[in-house]
Structures are given as structure tokens and as C-alpha cells.
Amino acid sequence: MRCLGCGRFCLRLLCATCQNILSSYTLKSRLVDGLEVFYFYAYSEISALLSTKHKLCGSGVFKALCQLSISRFAQSFYLPDVPLIHAIALDDNVKSGYSHSAIIAKALKNAQISPLPNALKAMSEVKYAGKSLEYRQKNPRNFKLLKPLKAPVILVDDIITTGLSMKEAKECVQSAGGEVLFGIVLADARE
């Protein structure tokens, strides 16, 4: 088997060298319509790994990426005076046998953060991959909140490009009376 990061022979999806490189991320953030969205990698650094989300090995790749980044963030994250926070994936529909955004939300689980599965659904089946900002604006995701919120929310996705999905999800949660603390993704497509 070959490492999906560098192509070297290894018995895992990612070799030890690639794991070391990916675990030395710098947490950055981007402001989207007043919402701070944290990310771990530039899209250009992990685009080949993210493209596996529609393949059989994708669930393993996303779990490995999350162990190296999101889970480590969750281990050290604590917000005083907030007993519970929900991690909500943007449209965690099962595609290709699993939901990549649900894997990311699950990686955030700690004593304070609890994933809330199947809470936010895109009512539109539009695909944004490779589409322009104009196309995205004309074809909204039309998110719908399917579960009542009992705690503040962290919005979760794999990539942030224009920020429209995060903005639309934030508006959906807020219109239902929920509070969005921030968003978190693996990669920023602008880098």
C-alpha cells in the first residue's frame, strides 16, 4: 500500500512522515459575515487528501486528518460557564457510504462538546464544487434545522471557500433562536 500523502510505501493511509507534517498545523481563522471560522490547513496542502471524500478510503483519510488536527483542538478547548456545546455538521447526509462532515463533528467530541447528528440539512441538492460565487449565490443550500437546540453551536464542515454555506447555516440556526459560537473546518480554499 502507498501513503496517500506522498506515495511512499507504508501500511497505513498516511505514513509517519506525512502524519508528522500534518500534525504541525497552525490554527488560523477567517471572518465570514461576523462569524469566525477556524481552519487547520491551506486547501493546497491537503487537496489530494480531501478529494478522497467520494472514495471508499475517504472515511479513513478524514478520520486520520481529524485525529491530527480537530481532535487535538478539542482536547484543549474549554469555554468557561458553558456546560454544553453542540457540534453541528453542515448537511451530514451519507454519501459514498459515510458522511465526511459527521466524521469531523464527531472528532470535536470532548467533555463539553457533543455532536448533534442529522440536525442541519440542506434542502437543495446543489453541488458547489468548482462553481463560481455567482452560481453559489443564485443556488442557496436552503438549510433546515431538524432538531431543537439546547446549547450553543459550533458549525462544522470540511472546506471553506466563499463562506456562503457557513453564512447560510449560521442564519438558519439563529433564526431558530440558536447561538453560533464559531465555525470550524479542515481547510481554507483561499490558501
Question: What do these predicted ranges mean?
Answer:
Residues C3-C6, C15-C18:
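Short cysteine-rich clusters marking metal-coordination/redox-active sites
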Residues C10-L11, L22:
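Cys/His-rich microdomains that often coordinate metals
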Residues A16-L84, V94-K95, A119-L149, A187-E191:
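Active-site-facing substrate-recognition patch
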Residues A89-S101:
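Glycine-rich phosphate-binding loops at beta-strand->alpha-helix junctions
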Residues K106-S114:
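Short helix-loop-beta junction
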Residues I154-L155:
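Residue-level marker for buried hydrophobic side chains located in beta-strands
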Residues T161-T162:
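Activation segment
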Residues K167-E191:
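PRPP-dependent phosphoribosyltransferase catalytic core
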